[in-house]
C-alpha cells in the first residue's frame, strides 16, 4: 500500500551553468536538504543539469557553437559515476528523486528525466518525445521505450513530463489512463510576459506555463502537481550570452515561476521573485478521491468504445537483428544503459524490476 500522507519539495533555483560537477554537487545538496526536512519526494526542473540552454532562442548558429560545445561536454550519461552519486544520495536520504538533465548517449543529447527510488534504483528513465522549436538544434527525440511517464511507487502512481509535454493532450491522456496521482511538471527557465513582443504568442513565456498549463494539468488529471522551475541571476545571464553580444542585466522576468497545485487545480504555493530554494507541500493522496469522483478520464468519465489512444512503446533501432519467424530482435534502452542493474552490484546480485 502506498503512503497517503507525506511531505514533498519542488526546486526553484539557478543551475550550475555549463558545469557538470558543480551541478551534481548542487543536486546532492538539495537532496540532502529535502531529506533533512523529512521529504519523501524532491522534484527538479527540466534539464537542471547542466541548465536549460535558453541562449539557443536568442542567438544565431555561429554564436551558439562555443556554448553548444561546452554544453555537450557537461551533459550527463546515465551510466556515469556522476549519475550514480545522485542515486546514492537518494538512497542515503531515503527519498524519491525526480531529476531532469541533459542526457548524452553516444553523440546525441536528450531532454531526460529519471525517477530514482529511496533505494537508489531507477524506477523510470524517460526522454522528451519531441524537442520544442529551436531545442531541435540541441536535442534528439525520445524513443518508444523512453517516453512512458507514470510508474507505481510507495508514494502512489507518479508521473513526469517536460515543459510543453504538460500541455500535450495525448500525453495527458496516457498519464490519466495509468491512474496518475502525483505529477512532476518540470519546466526550464524562460522569461515572463513583460518580454512579449508582437507577434510572439503568450504560449512562449513563463506565465501561462505556471498559471494556466500547470493548474489545468492538475484539475484535468486530478493529481497533485509539482512544477519546479529554473531561475537566473545577472551572472547567469552573462554566462548564457556569447562573446561580442551585450547581455541582459535584469534577470527578474525569469524568476518566480515555480508552483505547486492541488488535485482540484488550486494553488498551494508560489515563490517570490527573489526566492531560491525548495518549495514544500504536504501531500494527502486522499484529496484525489473527490476530484476523480467528479471526473475520472480513465474510468467512469470516458468512453473508450468511442475514443482510444494507440501507443507504441517499442524501440526502433537503426540497425536491427533478425530473429526466427521473420521477426526482429527487441531492444531496450534501459538494459543497454544498465539501468536494470542494482546501484552497487552486478547482474548476479539481483534484477531491478523494469518500470511498467
Swiss-Prot record:
Keywords: Hydrolase, Lyase. GO terms for molecular function: cyanide hydratase activity; nitrilase activity. It catalyses: formamide = hydrogen cyanide + H2O. The active site is at residues 46, 128, 163. PROSITE patterns: CN_HYDROLASE, NITRIL_CHT_1, NITRIL_CHT_2. Induction: By cyanide and propionitrile. The keyword Lyase applies. Its EC number is 4.2.1.66. It is an enzyme of class 4 (lyase). GO terms for biological process: cyanide catabolic process. The keyword Lyase applies. InterPro entries: C-N_Hydrolase (IPR003010), C-N_Hydrolase_sf (IPR036526), CN_hydrolase (IPR037544), Nitrilase/CN_hydratase_CS (IPR000132), Nitrilases_CHs (IPR044149). Residues 6-285 form the CN hydrolase domain. Pfam families: CN_hydrolase (PF00795). Oligomer of dimers, forming left-handed helical fibers. Belongs to the carbon-nitrogen hydrolase superfamily. Nitrilase family. Catalyzes the hydration of cyanide to formamide. Degradation of cyanide may be important for plant pathogenic fungi in infection of cyanogenic plants. This is Cyanide hydratase. It comes from Leptosphaeria maculans (Blackleg fungus).
